[in-house]
Amino acid sequence: PGYGFEALENMTRWDWGQDLFEWFEYYLQERGPKPSLDAQIQRNDGQWRVEETWPPADREPFTLDLSDCGNDGAFVGGGLSVVGGGQTVTVECPDINDDRDIHIAGLPTLHLSAVPTFDGGQVFIEMQDAMTGLRLGHATMDVRYHEGGYEPQTVIPGQQITMMMEFQGIDAILPAGNGLRFIFSDQGEDYLAPACGNACTVHILPSLSVFEAPTVERGPETILTVPQPQ
């Protein structure tokens, strides 16, 4: 779950050709009405809507301290959770939205406190709906780029750092009461394990880490009903 099957019934768009034709006519042939400049966004459950921009300008931050969550992983050297060498850590945050849906729209961040054991290594995070296991998105980062940017920095083994991780773009609904789950590892999706292998595990400190997601509230009036096959 989490790779589009849940949106299958609303995946086919029969009006793309019309949209492309209008753009071709106006911008290449210089005739006809100017197409609307907006974004058509599909939520993870398949629902379409129109936004002026994406991420939406009216987004509001939802902040979650992972210290309020429970974690289940391998514990070594002073009780820190370790990622890498085939080990994973799962952080469960069940009681975060008991009374309302959370609609994530944008690029969430997770500022992860970590202690590398090597000048190298990486952390991969998969975020899931804690109730259903539905994949919502992922993030990955090499510890040498923990502050961002394009140039690697030397990492001192044993020194605590904050990994400024950013998820791939997400537009997803988390139903009320379902909560979030974060699975930490050193590889996932099409990201291979680091070349340094088992030598470069990363100790993570969820209790000092913070997740933040851009959220919006959208009513039924924003839903875009698209043509469907008969």
Residue ranges of model-derived segments:
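Catalytic cores of eukaryotic secretory-pathway lumenal/extracellular enzymes that build
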Residues: 1-10
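Glycine/threonine-rich phosphate-binding loop and adjacent beta-strand/alpha-helix elements that clamp
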Residues: 16-18, 25-230
